Amino acid sequence: MTYNDFITEIWLAVGNCPKSWRKGQKVFNTIEDLYGNVAREVQLIDGVDCFYDDRDETINLFIDKCWYRMCSTNLKK
């Protein structure tokens, strides 16, 4: 999977989230659903959380950190 594939998959899935959810909440829950605990690791270990923060810069940083963690985990295998 490339970074662009990752981004595309997230935003396609975000489009299917409940309309009542905030943008950051949609991104966080989508990544958690698709990729497991990487969202929680970024939230709790890296200190980047978009669940309650809908600013684009926070969401983009959260997505980038998730991608980095996923790539780092795959390199260790």
Task: Please provide the spans of the model-predicted regions.
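C-terminal alpha-helical interaction appendages
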Residues: 1-77
